[in-house]
Swiss-Prot record, chain B:
PROSITE patterns: SOMATOTROPIN_1, SOMATOTROPIN_2. It comes from Bos taurus (Bovine). Residues 1-30 form the signal peptide. It comes from the Eukaryota. This is Prolactin. Disulfide bonds join C34-C41, C88-C204, C221-C229. Interacts with PRLR. Pfam families: Hormone_1 (PF00103). InterPro entries: 4_helix_cytokine-like_core (IPR009079), Somatotropin/Prolactin (IPR001400), Somatotropin_CS (IPR018116). The modification Phosphoserine is found at S56, S64, S120. It is found in: Secreted. Its main location: secreted.
């Protein structure tokens, strides 16, 4: 009997259970917490997912406790967050504290609790999308037009105090395009978009993110229509211009490369170097100086007969201690283009000497100064070439008055090489010998064997010098001079005489013989100097010929039989013979 | 004669010093507001705050990454989190827990809290690097970040001391800071226990770096931008 009762009870229970199961009633399934999110690090909301409710009405509760506390709290707000949510307000939110949250499902059959969720609000921050997204097309003057996008921070975020740090991302695209153009802004709440295609409809979206947390959702799309007449900078034109200029540059570079040198010379012509007309460098290289010089000769140099007329040179013949006959350049003379030479005055003779080094160098350099046909002076070495007709004879130099270099041409009627006259101011007043007569004496003393010739020379020299004075006095003095000159052994007596009798002479300027011309064979053509003071109408021309040059550099003059003036000859001839031994 | 020469020498040396000082001072940045004297006054407060905020942000990023890496590798399904509650050695510091509390805290207090946190993490960071190195199969991601965090922490501490000197001149920094004593648990032989200890440490590091970062950003907006960020 008892056994029957027990088995009956079990059977009934089983029936009851099976009946209830068949009805679908059971304790609820464990709910599941889905996520918790904080929009601004000040509040947060948790959502759960309910399980099967077991066929019976089920209540869900959320309980939690904080880290470091034992007290269990229930969710303060089930509604704000929507169904199956729990909203924690500011009062209930603590940062940097772990929340242990559990959701319980309760129905008639039982209670089911979810797995606990450990939540730290710091790490569950996900803001709302930015709000108030506005789009505006702007056309400022003098600047490119653009699309101006503005927005404001999402709700529930305190950005001003710095509690919530936020960054934004905007994306836009033409309506029919597939790819979005994204822009990132770290803080600001506006953005300007340039380079928009006119006639298109653009869609714009924005989202944001906290400094540490999750990206928000994209905001709803905003759209804007770009009008057809929207001015946009056309880059294709600029590209065309750039390509064209590049092509032009390439062409120019190529042209320069091909004709580089000629173009350079066209733009920057080379500085012309010195060039001698008629001067062939190659001839010089070959060493054929004769041809070279002939080429130079042909260049209308030296001056022709005109120059001969112009050549007015005086030879100062005077005696000196050294007993040398020295040709002296005349005081006055300026040839066309010929520059006066400066004579150095030696201390010994009181005369400018031809052998002074500076003078020699001057004379050597003289052709350079001469406005000749030569374009460039080729150098002093050339001048010393005897074939050039421009010679400076390099006589041995001596410190004393001896060995004075006569300066004369080697050949050719090159008037430019004649010693140039020096200005009268340079003449030393120390000259004590200033007439040919004295020189004659010297010459007599020097060359005894050539007395006769010297006599003749004397005569002619006298004749030559005589022309300076046309007055009788002058002649008288000349006669006296000639007397003195012809007495050879009486040098001692001769000497004072001219000095005594030559007060006039001494007061007078030096007597000169004019060199009329120099012929081909070295003939000095002299003629008396015209003295305007005396109104000398003397136009006769007398010539002396240089017969030779002695070893001691004495010019030996010989009478020119062709151009003798008989009247002049007579007088000295009368008086000379008695004086002759 | 000697004195004359030496005085000349001295004057020349002085002149040289002055000139060199002037030349060196050319490279100094911006104009400082310097109540503390010429000691640390070469960078403006704004620049100091900018720099500090950058560094604190960086440290927090690194800490988060390191924690996530460790969690993914060693803590899956182990329930270490349960043990991590109340395990931070810096919990004794009275740090504000929400925005209102933080906004009501004076900046002096906030700054000294920051300094205390930074100082209290010097030692644990050093040991963390050592111990992670010795960890079996430790991924380079964790180790490199640990090294970087240790370095940046020192830098931030220096910067914070400078800021403190400028904002609160004359204040003495004698606040005590919490001492970490979790080294034995890092070195225990029980692997689970050791990993749990590491987990705790990384969890606390992530949290404290977040605190420092948030407080600094708050101070930056308050002091430099006058609550108008």
């Amino acid at each position: 009997m008892k056994e029957n009762a027990a088995s009956r009870v079990v059977f009934i229970l089983l029936l009851f259970l099976s009946v209830s199961l068949l009805n679908g009633q059971s304790p609820p399934e464990k709910p599941k917490l889905v996520k918790c999110r904080s929009p601004g690090k000040e509040t947060f909301t948790c959502w759960w997912e309910p399980g099967a409710d077991g066929g019976l009405p089920t209540n869900y509760t959320l309980t939690y406790h904080k880290e470091g506390e034992t007290l269990i709290h229930e969710c303060p707000d089930y509604k704000t967050g929507g169904p199956n949510s729990c909203y924690f307000s500011k009062k209930h939110t603590s940062i940097w504290k772990m929340y242990v949250i559990t959701v319980n499902a309760i129905n008639q059959m039982g209670i089911s609790s979810s797995d606990p969720l450990y939540v730290d609000v710091t790490y569950i921050v996900e803001p709302e999308p930015p709000a108030n997204l506005t789009l505006e097309l702007k056309h400022p003057e003098d600047r490119k037009p653009y699309l101006w996008i503005k927005w404001s921070p999402p709700t529930m975020t305190d950005v001003k105090s710095g509690w919530f740090i936020i960054q934004y991302e905007i994306r836009l695209k033409p309506e029919k395009a597939t790819d979005w153009e994204t822009h990132f802004t770290p803080k600001q709440t506006q953005l300007k978009i340039f380079n928009l295609y006119p006639g298109q409809k653009y869609l714009v979206q924005i989202r944001c993110k906290p400094d540490h947390g999750y990206w928000s959702e994209w905001s709803p799309e905003s759209s804007i229509q770009i009008p057809n007449d929207f001015p946009v900078k056309d880059t294709s034109m600029w590209i065309f211009v750039a390509i064209l200029s590049a092509v032009i540059c390439l062409i120019m570079v190529w042209a320069v490369a091909l004709k580089g040198y000629s173009m350079v010379t066209c733009i920057l012509p080379p500085v012309p170097g010195p060039k001698i007309k008629g001067f062939d460098v190659h001839l010089l290289e070959k060493g054929k100086s004769e041809e070279l010089l002939r080429a130079l000769e042909s260049q209308d140099f030296p001056p022709t007969s005109d120059c001969e007329d112009l050549l007015m040179e005086f030879i100062e013949v005077d005696d000196c201690e050294d007993q040398q006959l020295m040709p002296r350049p005349s005081k006055e003379h300026t040839e066309q283009g010929v520059k006066p030479m400066h004579l150095d005055l030696d201390s010994d003779s009181g005369r400018g000497s031809c052998d002074s080094p500076s003078l020699l160098s001057e004379k050597c350099d003289e052709p350079q100064a001469h406005p000749s046909k030569f374009h460039t002076p080729e150098g002093p070495e050339k001048l010393e070439n005897p074939e050039t007709n421009l010679t400076c004879l390099q006589a041995p130099q001596s410190t004393s008055g001896e060995g004075k270099i006569p300066y004369f041409l080697a050949n050719g009627p090159k008037s430019s090489t004649w010693p140039f006259p020096q200005p009268p101011s340079l003449y030393s007043p120390r000259y004590s010998y200033h007439n040919i007569a004295d020189v004659c004496e010297l010459a007599l003393g020097m060359a005894g064997t050539t007395a006769t010739s010297l006599d003749q020379t004397d005569q002619h020299a006298l004749k030559a010098s005589k022309t300076i004075e046309t007055g009788r006095e002058g002649k008288a003095t000349k006669q006296r001079e000639s007397e003195g000159c012809s007495s050879k052994p009486d040098q001692d007596t001769v000497w004072p005489r001219p000095q005594d009798k030559t007060p006039l002479i001494s007061a007078k300027p030096l007597e000169y013989v004019e060199i009329h011309k120099v012929s081909q064979d070295g003939v000095l053509a002299l003629f008396p100097k015209q003295n305007e003071k005396f109104g000398a109408p003397e136009a006769s021309k007398e010539y002396s010929k240089v017969s030779r040059v002695t070893d001691s550099n004495i010019l030996v003059l010989v009478p020119d039989p062709q151009a003798q003036n008989l009247t002049l000859l007579e007088e000295p001839a009368k008086k000379a013979p008695p004086a002759l031994p | 004669m000697d004195s004359k020469g030496s005085s000349q020498k001295g004057s020349r040396l002085l002149l040289l010093l002055v000139v060199s000082n002037l030349l060196l001072c050319q490279g100094v940045v911006s104009t400082p507001v310097c109540p503390n004297g010429p000691g640390n006054c070469q960078v403006s407060l704004r620049d100091l705050f900018d720099r500090a905020v950058m560094v604190s942000h960086y440290i927090h990023d690194l800490s988060s990454e390191m924690f996530n890496e460790f969690d993914k590798r060693y803590a899956q399904g182990k329930g270490f989190i349960t043990m991590a509650l109340n395990s931070c050695h810096t919990s004794s510091l009275p740090t504000p827990e929400d925005k209102e509390q933080a906004q009501q805290t004076h900046h002096e207090v906030l700054m000294s809290l920051i300094l205390g946190l930074l100082r209290s993490w010097n030692d644990p960071l050093y040991h963390l690097v050592t111990e992670v190195r010795g960890m079996k199969g430790a991924p380079d991601a964790i180790l490199s970040r640990a090294i970087e965090i240790e370095e940046e922490n020192k830098r931030l501490l220096e910067g914070m001391e400078m800021i403190f000197g400028q904002v609160i001149p004359g204040a003495k920094e004698t606040e005590p800071y919490p001492v970490w004593s979790g080294l034995p648990s890092l070195q225990t032989k029980d692997e689970d226990a050791r990993y749990s200890a590491f987990y705790n440490l990384l969890h606390c590091l992530r949290r404290d770096s977040s605190k420092i970062d948030t407080y600094l950003k708050l101070l930056n907006c308050r002091i430099i931008y006058n609550n108008n960020c």
